């Protein structure tokens, strides 16, 4: 095989991974000095070289974890193809990440942000905060994806190129307004443009929140109302249940009931 990295990326593309995943994986694999010929020392030396950014600052644990995952997937594919006998990622140390809770937009701020927004921006904010869509999904969703008969919004080829449905709420429909044709946000945009537009609008209105924190608001409210992590993962397009628990924020009433129950004997 003349170029194993190109062959791997072609296989990943056939599996319908997102363009963002393909770009990130190609970038990481390009740093491997000898993709199929790295022994333990070479693998550890490569890993050491990834600990700092070009500017000399240390890489964040989340970034390192992603780099390790991309390399490990490549080597796992190489083993399936009979190109390697073992996965060099087994020599790499575990990346420890701090488990942080999601930060969400306060309800008062969300009300003000929606009230002041022009229709295209109001729809972007609503799709993130009231439907839990990612920036790429907001850019792609069209009026034809609103299925009023079944009460759902269809998200076509979300993360991992997977389709899913998001239940429609009266509040979301009110913020979206009268249906039209084409993209719900009013024009063709990509994920980066949506994220940047939301960020600029939020900062202009005195908020340092982001598109992701608008999405986090939806997931925390969904979990608080249902207590159903499986349903939350499905509606959010998460394949891993463990990633949804960071959005679980217990209310003070829930914690008080728990404390009262634990404080009783018998």
Question: How would you describe each model-predicted region?
Answer:
Residues 6-101, 206:
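N-terminal core-binding DNA-recognition domain of tyrosine recombinases/integrases
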Residues 72, 122-136, 152, 220-221, ...:
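Short pre-functional
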Residues 84, 96-99, 107-135, 139:
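Basic, Lys/Arg- and aromatic-enriched nucleic-acid-binding interface segment
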Residues 84-86, 97-112, 160-170, 182-184:
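DNA breakage-rejoining catalytic core of tyrosine-based enzymes
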Residues 137-138, 209-210, 219, 227-238, ...:
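Active-site-proximal segment of tyrosine recombinases
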Residues 140-176, 242:
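Conserved tyrosine-mediated DNA breakage-rejoining catalytic core shared by Y-recombinases
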Residues 157-160, 236-261:
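Catalytic-site neighborhood detector that most strongly recognizes the C-terminal catalytic loop/helix
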Residues 169-208, 218:
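Active-site/catalytic core of tyrosine-dependent DNA strand-transfer enzymes
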């Amino acid at each position: 095989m003349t170029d194993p990295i190109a062959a791997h990326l072609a296989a990943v593309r056939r599996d319908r991974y997102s363009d963002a995943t393909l770009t990130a994986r190609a970038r990481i694999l390009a740093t491997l000095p000898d993709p199929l010929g790295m022994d333990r020392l070479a693998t550890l030396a490569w890993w050491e070289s990834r600990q700092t950014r070009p500017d000399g600052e240390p890489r964040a644990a989340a970034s390192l974890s992603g780099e390790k995952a991309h390399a490990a997937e490549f080597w796992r594919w190489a083993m399936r193809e009979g190109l390697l006998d073992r996965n060099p990622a087994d020599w790499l140390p575990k990346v420890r990440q701090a488990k942080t809770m999601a930060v969400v937009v306060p309800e008062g701020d969300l009300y003000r942000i929606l009230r002041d927004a022009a229709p295209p921006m109001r729809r972007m904010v609503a799709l993130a905060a009231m439907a839990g869509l990612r920036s790429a999904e907001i850019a792609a969703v069209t009026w034809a994806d609103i299925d009023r008969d079944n009460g759902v919004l269809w998200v076509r080829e979300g993360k991992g190129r997977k389709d899913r449905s998001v239940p429609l709420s009266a509040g979301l429909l009110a913020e979206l307004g009268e249906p039209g044709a084409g993209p719900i946000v009013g024009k063709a945009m990509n994920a980066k443009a949506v994220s940047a537009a939301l960020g600029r609008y939020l900062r202009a209105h005195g908020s340092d929140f982001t598109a992701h924190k608008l999405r986090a608001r939806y997931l925390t409210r969904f979990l608080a109302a249902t207590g159903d992590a499986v349903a939350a993962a499905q509606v959010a397009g998460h394949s891993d249940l463990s990633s949804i628990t960071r959005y679980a924020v217990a209310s003070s009433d829930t914690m008080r009931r728990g404390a009262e129950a634990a404080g009783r004997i018998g």
